[in-house]
Structure formats: C-alpha cells, structure tokens
From Swiss-Prot:
Keywords linked to the UniProt accession: Antibiotic biosynthesis, FAD, Flavoprotein, Monooxygenase, NAD, NADP, Oxidoreductase
Parts of the chain that traverse the membrane: none
E.C. no: 1.14.13.217
Up-regulation conditions: By N-acylhomoserine lactone (AHL).
Record: residues binding FAD: 2-20
GO biological process, one term: antibiotic biosynthetic process
Protein name: Protodeoxyviolaceinate monooxygenase
Cofactor: FAD
InterPro entries: FAD/NAD-bd_sf, PheA/TfdB_FAD_monoxygenase
Pathway linked to the protein: Pigment biosynthesis; violacein biosynthesis
Job of this protein: Catalyzes the oxygenation of the 6-position of protodeoxyviolaceinate to form proviolacein.
Gene name linked to the record: vioD
Broad enzyme group: oxidoreductase
Length: 373
C-alpha cells in the first residue's frame, strides 16, 4: 500500500504515525505547502494526561513532558466583572501548538516517514493519483479540494463575529471566559495557559464593535494595545502578541456531506472545522484519524475501507458541526443576554449545546471502536 498525506499538521501526522505503527511495511509520504518553521498558532487544549488519554496526541510521543504541558481543571466565567468559578468536568491539557506539531513530525521521521516541505502540489491543482493507492487531504481549512474533485467541494460559511488569536505572557491557571462591556461594545476573551511562560488569548467581537473601534484601520501593534486596554484587569500589564497570518477575521466553517471520493479522503479541518469556543478541534482530528487507520487495517481494500470510514466518521463530524455552530451562534448573539444576572448568564452558557447528544461521549465511543484493531 502506498499512501500520500497532504498536510503536516496534527490530523495528517497522527494518521501517518498510527498507520505506520500498525502497518510498518506500507509506504507513507507527507507533503506540506509551508516551510518547516511556519506553524501558526499559540496554545491548544487537549483532553486528559498524556499516556492516559488516547485522544490526546501527546500520548503518541516518546517524551511528552518535553512540551511542558499545562493541566487545567477549573473554569472561570466573568460577566459584568463578576467571576463564576466552575469545574471543567474533565482534566484539560494546554500545550504549544508549534511544539506539538514539531514533535509529531519528529515522531513520523523516526518511523521512516518522509516529510517534504514547500511542496507545490496544491498550487498546481494536480495530484499524482496514479502513483498512490490513497491520498489523504489533511491540509486545513484553506485546502483546495475543489481543484481535484467536484464531489469534495466544501460548503463554506462565515461567522458574524470578528476574532483574533493572540498570545500573552500573562498566565491563566484556569480556563477563562471574559465578557467585557467597553462603552457601547462587548468584547469576549477566551484565555488559558499552555506553558510556564505563555497563554493563549483569543478575542472576539461583533462586526459593529470592530467597525466602531476602527480595529481594521489599526496596525497589528495598535490593535493589540487597544485590546489589551479593554482587558487590562485580566492582563495585569502584560501585553498581547500577534503572529503574521493570524489577524482579525470572521470564523470560517468548512463542511462536507461526504468524507471521500475515489482515492481521496479528507481529515481534520479539511473535512470539518469547528468554532474555537467548544475546544474539540485537535481531539476531533485525532479521533477521526484513528477511525481511518482502523478502516484501512480491518477492511479489504481501499474502497471498502473508505466506505466504512465514512459510515463511522460522518455522523461524528456532523455532531461536531452541530455543537460548534450552536456555540458560535450563542457567542454571536450574546448581547441579547448581557442584561441577565450572572447566575442566569452562566445557565444560558451551559445550555447552549444541551439540545444535542454530548460531544465527549461521542468522541470516546468512536475512539474506543477505532482502537480495537
């Protein structure tokens, strides 16, 4: 079996590494459009402790402690400057995204999987399908699947809020969610530490707030300073740091009604992206990657494997989208609920996804199935 993985992010790397472990004689190549050092993002949240939770990609590394994971069990929601403290319900693990990606790449290389960077494959819209038995598209929300097959053209929707992903040297020992009224405007911050020295700090606001504050007219530095003043109570004098390519934008939800076509199969955000407010993106990437490994290892041939993979993965992907969309819309319409008491506000926040089957249980059930090979 000869397999090409497009995209050297968590989804493609976990898939390649786990499949190579299960089928060491199969040939697996990975190509990535960016250079080796170009990894966007600050911290990501993962479930459980490495080695104890198979949905945590750190569990597949030989020395996960080198990434200095941070463990979070408490959740703080601030509404009208009044904090409400809660339990996350599960142990969460914050880690630097760049460090995670580099460690997963090293793991693949140690297994004999070649990774080629700055690959022009996607730019030309042509894939060497004749050279491979399977091509895995795991190259994120900006993938150009439409160049390859009409059946996998994504459905793309944009959220109403603007958001930006910052880093900060202020350390947040809890999962923090802050709703801050600033004049006529409302800003929302999602913050948590991912190392001994840094935290993720995601900020979102309505299009109207973004326009009134003239954030689109500011430089990256001026915008970061403005937002830092809005959240000065939380940041305590620490600044906000931006990355090139992570400026203000509307959240893009990318979806598909199917997972594969011919030799092509989708993984990770290339299959389904989900709003950052539910925090399951990397976990989804791991679970769905394991489902594909399971199908390839237990079914007779690629067509049968992809059929079985879609039967298992698509319902999970659709549930993930439902949770993410419900959560995104709640945040986009939060102004309607800012008048509530803090207790009522927390209750509304907790209820925003209660109409759907629980996501953690669905992930756990599918992962247990995938690991029975």
């Amino acid at each position: 079996m000869k397999i090409l993985v497009i995209g050297a992010g968590p989804a493609g790397l976990v898939f390649a590494s786990q499949l190579k472990q299960a089928r060491p004689l199969w040939a697996i190549d990975i190509v990535e459009k960016n250079d080796e050092q170009e990894v966007l993002g600050w911290g990501v949240v993962l479930p459980g402790r490495p080695g104890q939770h198979p949905a945590n990609p750190l569990s597949y590394l030989d020395a996960p402690e080198r990434l200095n994971p941070q463990f979070l069990e408490d959740f703080k929601l601030v509404h009208h400057n009044e904090p409400s403290l809660m339990s996350t319900g599960v142990l969460l693990c914050g880690v630097e995204r760049r460090g995670l990606v580099h460690a997963l790449r090293d793991k693949c290389r140690s297994q004999g999987i070649a990774i080629r960077f700055e690959s022009p494959l996607l730019e030309h819209g042509e894939l060497p399908l004749a050279d491979y038995d399977l091509v895995v598209l795991a190259n994120g929300v900006n993938h150009k699947t439409a160049h390859f097959t009409e059946a996998l053209v994504p459905q793309v929707d944009y959220g109403r809020n603007k958001y930006i992903w910052y880093g900060t040297s202020q350390l947040f020992d809890q999962m923090n969610l802050v709703f801050r009224t600033h004049g006529k405007d409302i800003f929302i911050a999602h913050a948590y530490k991912y190392s001994d020295t840094m935290s993720t700090f995601i900020v979102e606001c309505s299009e109207e707030t973004y326009a009134r504050a003239r954030l689109g007219e500011m430089s990256e530095e001026a915008s970061a300073e403005y937002v830092a003043k809005v959240f000065q109570a939380e940041l305590g004098g620490h600044g906000l740091v931006s990355q090139p390519g992570l400026g203000w934008r509307n959240f893009m939800t990318l979806s598909h009604d199917r997972c594969h076509d011919g030799k092509l199969v989708l993984l990770g955000d290339a299959l389904q992206s989900g709003h950052f407010s539910i925090g399951h993106g990397t976990t989804m990437a791991v679970v769905v990657a394991q489902l594909l490994v399971k199908a390839l290892c237990t079914e007779d041939g690629v067509p049968a494997a992809l059929k079985r993979f879609e039967e298992r993965a698509l319902p999970l992907v659709q549930l993930f989208r439902g949770h993410a969309d419900n959560s995104r819309v709640w945040f986009e319409t939060v102004e309607e609920r800012m008048h509530l008491s803090s207790a009522e506000f927390v209750q509304s926040f907790d209820a925003r996804r209660k109409s759907l089957p629980p996501m953690p249980e669905a992930l756990a059930q599918n992962l247990r199935y995938a690991l029975q090979r």
